[in-house]
């Protein structure tokens, strides 16, 4: 039998990491084992269970959650052969009825906005999003509609890879939809924080996973955002043939500096605020995290993607409209421009004055 060698290099996964330059992340077998073991600890899958693989295998999130996780248990893996549009994904869920679903936030957000909320009366949809306590029958109907869209046979949807829209998350939380948020990075193969959906706190990404330690580099982690630093079995060996970059991200005490800013409550739940290098500092001294504003924009009518930046000390949003959806509803180019201006005005009313 082959001797176990936990520190042996298993995978080199290339990533832009925290500096923008492509680097080869050297993941040892212990990292892959620890990540896969955590998946089974949180949500065991059985031989014959169905899993739809729609994340890119070149991304460690897809490699672990959409392949190694199910493969190690003898699950049946189904690979999408086309780009995962909401329509194609919904069709695959209906046919395959997966037991576990792993995806990026945008997929869930698009399906919720296009395929679930339209099934509810607009007034009810708005009520669910804004009122903390709603009628149990309304919540049950909304939850059932959402479950059916995703195949109706899953235990939990695992969302990761990008910030999750706050409004969509509030909707899912209110109807009792089984989702969880996973936070991580390639350098940890990938998971750093996560929790079961029953215990996940809204807006957080859960707690440190098994065999990992997480700290917030801040004088007051509960109220002042600081950099997320971590260490444990999931950590990489370093960057391939790049010791200088390795020493810049892993300090002498073995802590990996993620470059992400977050707070942590007294129970250990981590809430990511944004990237330290993305933080915008205004002339008035206000710290603004563009991801939080972009998340709101991306949930507004006919918005596909957004980018918030600072120009001459003014916040500016670059918007790429959802032209397919807009044209399908009969909107002209002029109508789309007017809608974007309406979105801007509405969002400004929700944001702090600074």
Where on the chain are the PLM-derived regions?
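Conserved pre-ATP/AMP-binding loop-to-beta segment of ANL
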Residues: 1-14, 21, 44-50
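Conserved ATP-binding/catalytic segment of the ANL
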Residues: 15, 215, 222-282
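Conserved AMP-binding/adenylation subdomain of ANL enzymes
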Residues: 33-50, 57-144, 178
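Conserved ATP-binding loop and adjacent catalytic segment of the adenylate-forming AMP-binding
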Residues: 78-80, 153, 157-159, 166-226, ...
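AMP-binding/adenylate-forming catalytic core of the ANL superfamily
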Residues: 232, 237-238, 261-354
């Amino acid at each position: 039998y082959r001797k176990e060698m936990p520190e042996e290099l298993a995978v080199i996964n290339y990533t832009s990491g925290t500096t923008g330059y492509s680097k080869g992340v050297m993941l040892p077998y212990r990292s892959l084992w620890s990540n896969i073991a955590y998946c089974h600890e949180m949500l065991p899958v059985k031989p014959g269970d169905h899993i739809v693989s729609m994340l890119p295998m070149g991304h460690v999130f897809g490699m672990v959650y959409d392949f190694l996780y199910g493969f190690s248990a003898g699950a049946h893996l189904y690979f999408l052969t086309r780009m995962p549009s909401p329509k194609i994904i919904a069709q695959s869920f209906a046919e395959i009825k997966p037991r576990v679903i792993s995806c990026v936030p945008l997929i869930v957000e698009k399906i919720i906005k296009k395929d679930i909320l339209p099934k509810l009366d607009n007034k009810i949809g708005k009520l669910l999003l804004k009122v903390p306590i709603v009628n149990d029958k309304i919540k049950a109907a909304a939850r059932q509609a959402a479950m059916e869209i995703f195949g109706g046979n899953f235990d939990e949807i695992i969302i990761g890879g990008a910030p999750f829209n706050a409004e969509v998350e509030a909707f899912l939380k209110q109807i009792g939809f089984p989702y969880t948020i996973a936070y991580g990075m390639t350098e940890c193969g990938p998971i750093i924080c996560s929790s079961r959906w029953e215990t996940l706190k809204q807006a957080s990404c859960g707690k440190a996973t098994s065999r990992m330690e997480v700290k917030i580099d801040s004088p007051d982690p509960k109220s002042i955002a600081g950099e997320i630093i971590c260490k444990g079995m999931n950590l990489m060996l370093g960057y391939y043939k790049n010791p200088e970059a390795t020493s810049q991200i892993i300090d002498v005490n073995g802590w990996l500096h993620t470059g992400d800013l977050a707070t942590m409550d007294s129970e250990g739940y981590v809430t990511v605020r944004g990237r330290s290098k993305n933080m915008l500092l205004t002339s008035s001294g206000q710290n603004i995290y563009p991801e939080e504003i972009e998340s709101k924009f991306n949930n507004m009518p006919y918005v596909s993607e957004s980018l918030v930046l600072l120009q001459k000390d003014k916040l500016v949003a670059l918007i790429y409209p959802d032209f397919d959806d807009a044209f399908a509803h009969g909107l002209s180019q002029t109508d789309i421009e007017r809608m974007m201006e309406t979105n801007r005005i509405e969002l400004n009313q929700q944001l702090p004055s600074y």
